[in-house]
Every structure is written in structure tokens, then in C-alpha cells.
Amino acid sequence: LSLLGVGALALLVCCGGCGFRFWSLSDPDHQITISPETTVFTEPLKPNGDVDFIAALDDRLSEGVTPENNAVVLLVEAFGPGEIRAENRSEFFAKLGVPALPEVGDYLIGEYAYAKELADISGQHVGDVSEAFFENRAEASSRPWTRDEFNEVAAMLERNSEALDLVVQASRRPRYYSPLIVDIEHPMLISVLLPIEQQQREGVRQLTSRAMLKLEEGDAEGAWEDLLSCHRLARRLSENWSMIGGLVSIAIDANAVESDEAYLESDAVTAD
């Protein structure tokens, strides 16, 4: 499905679910017959006989998805399970069709977490260290740079090298399916958790910085692959059903464009 199609489907599910619920509450004695004439989805059903719209949407989004073609499988390997609630992890990974990941691993470390480590080592205030580090990392995405210029940014990228490579690999996969997991106390579509979507902005920021470092060091092909990966990831994320997923997709695509311009303006890039 296209982003527009998925968004329309999600809106239909949300409105359909709300309408059905309103009807039930306004006239609890009136039972609606579940059929294609009354609702797009006719199954699965909840114990009370209502259509389980979240499960229906999840089934639709997961059609044809396997652990081998799903970008989310590699993205979770890159970022780790930390943003997935502990009580939801078994269900999340079961729906992905892969074993659950351990809490601790060689996962991508974000800018703030890395800056906090620097502050702890130096004894400086974390706010001062993080502000300077964020500025350097942002500049490192805007132009070619050397390891001597931004040595701490280079060290973070080196530490995250394998995780970033997983993000690149994920971008090459043709499908994007992140299981719809809801809070049991609030089983509504609006309460579906999005544990992987926001983390991709962190991955793209670091990939664009790595691309500019590769460009400065003469690896124009590797730099271009990192940038293309950002755009491919945005396309994959656009398959997400939610408005948040669509907005993050637009944001990471836009983040990569600035680095694209720096790449194309560089003397290291030739017509060949």
C-alpha cells in the first residue's frame, strides 16, 4: 500500500471503530450484524462480538511480510529493544517472527547518551557538553570534515559502525512492518506504541555525518551509499500506517537532502 492508501485505511479503521463503539454505547440492546455491508472488516472478533479493528489492521499490514524481507527486523537489531516496553516484547518479537533480543548489546548509542558519557568522564555539566557535541554533529552532516576536526563525533560513529551498517542493510529490504502493540488498559488505535519510528531519526543523523566523513576521506561511493540509505529508509517508513510514521519519513528525507547538496558540491565527486 502507498502512504496515502495506508493512511486512508488507518483513518477508516479508526472512524469505523469509533462509529461502531458509539452505536453500541448509544443503544446497547441493538446488535449490528457483522458483514461487508456494515463494516469493511468482518474479522477477527473480540469476545463481545465487536470487530477487533487493531488486529484486523495488523493482519493487513503484515501480509506477505517475512523476517527476511522486513526492514524492522534489522532496525531493531541496530537500535535494540530498549524502547519496547518489557511487557510487550514477547508479543512484538513473536509477530516479527524472530527471537527476542537481550536488553544489553552492541546497539546504536544516541547523541545524548554519548554526550552524557563524555560529561561523566570530563566532570563537566552534561548540558554544556551535549550542546557543543550536538552542534559539532550537526555541522558534520552539512559538509565534509576530518576526524581531527570533530574527534568525538568520529569516535561515536566508529563505536556505532556495525549498528549503522545494519540500518543501511535494513533500508535495502522491500517491506516495513512494525507490529501493532496496544496498552491492555487502553486498547484503542490511538494508543498503539511506535517504538522503532523515532529512533530512525537518530540513525539518519549519524549516517549523514558518516557520509560526509567518508567523502572527506576519499570514499565517495561509500558516502553516497550512506545517503541513499537515508532516502530508502524514508521510503520504507512511509509504509507505516500512522501519521507519526509519515512525518518522521518526511523529516529524515529532508535531513538527508542537506547532505546530498554538500556531496554534489564536493570536488571529490566526479562525473564518473
What annotation goes with each model-predicted range?
Residues 10-21:
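Hydrophobic alpha-helical membrane-insertion segments, chiefly the h-region
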Residues 1-11:
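N-terminal Sec-pathway targeting helices
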Residues 20-272:
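Aromatic-rich surface patch/π-platform used for binding flat ligands and interfaces
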